[in-house]
Amino acid sequence: MLNLLNTLFLNVISNDVPTPYGIYFQDSATPNQEGILELHDNIMFYLFIILGLVSWMLFTIVKTYSKNPMAYKYIKHGQTIEIIWTMFPAVILLIIAFPSFILLYLCDEVISPAMTIKAIGYQWYWKYEYSDFINDNGETIEFESYVIPDDLLEEGQLRLLDTDTSVVVPVDTHIRFVVTGADVIHDFAIPSLGIKVDANPGRLNQVSALIQREGVFYGQCSELCGVNHAAMPIKIEAVSLPKFLEWLNEQ
């Protein structure tokens, strides 16, 4: 019981990674994810209003007709109520649709990114290419990222989430992720960054991220891609610009 309460408490104060008994989104680190959270909360508010009204109507109808089973014979055609129950749902849908479309187009826009990272999905690992940077050998910086097996996990590392190499990016920098697949369809998804994009073989999809705080953010392949689908984690380390430049010099 104590472990359960501790886990629930940690979910409230810190939720950058998937946790047991988690019932809400991970903490957002990008404007896109902030918009997604706000849209979700607004829609849930409207849903509770609708649930309350419908429940009240059902309760009233059951209460009324249980006392007088013949009352329905005295009900006549009511144009006013028909207009109300047609217009009210339409207004609610419009209130939900407009912010949703705006957010959808904002998340899809990638304008003048400061750097580009290419993520290629394989069965069953990820390969990353920093196409804007070249090492001392004149080659593009690239590496592969594999899940750490259970028997090699160290204390504090997360099962099926930690990887042998991390994607290191600077904070407060407009980053473009170009995503594709090498064999079957994969999906590049990082909840805290508001990123979820298909990795289709033969096609390049792109998504942008502006990470606003330092930290380690985890994701996974979100498209069933074979027997080891669960062994395709994604680990993003967001660091300050000086630390990022230091990391680049080490590559």
Curated annotation (Swiss-Prot):
Q: What does this protein do?
A: Component of the cytochrome c oxidase, the last enzyme in the mitochondrial electron transport chain which drives oxidative phosphorylation. The respiratory chain contains 3 multisubunit complexes succinate dehydrogenase (complex II, CII), ubiquinol-cytochrome c oxidoreductase (cytochrome b-c1 complex, complex III, CIII) and cytochrome c oxidase (complex IV, CIV), that cooperate to transfer electrons derived from NADH and succinate to molecular oxygen, creating an electrochemical gradient over the inner membrane that drives transmembrane transport and the ATP synthase.
Which Gene Ontology MF annotations are present? copper ion binding; cytochrome-c oxidase activity
* Required cofactor names: Cu cation
Indicate where this protein is primarily found: mitochondrion
Q: Which InterPro entries match?
A: CcO_II, CcO_II-like_C, CcO_II_C, Copper_CuA, Cupredoxin, Cyt_c_oxidase_su2, Cyt_c_oxidase_su2_TM_dom, Cyt_c_oxidase_su2_TM_sf
Q: Please state where this protein is localized.
A: Mitochondrion inner membrane
**Membrane topology, record value:** Multi-pass membrane protein
Name of the featured protein: Cytochrome c oxidase subunit 2
**GO annotation, cellular component aspect:** mitochondrial inner membrane
Q: Where does Cu cation A1 bind?
A: 186, 221, 225, 232
| Residue numbers binding Mg(2+) | 223
Query: Which EC class is this protein assigned?
Result: translocase
- Membrane-crossing segments per the record: 42-62, 83-103
The reaction(s) catalysed by this protein are:
4 Fe(II)-[cytochrome c] + O2 + 8 H(+)(in) = 4 Fe(III)-[cytochrome c] + 2 H2O + 4 H(+)(out)
Which family does the record assign?
A: Belongs to the cytochrome c oxidase subunit 2 family.
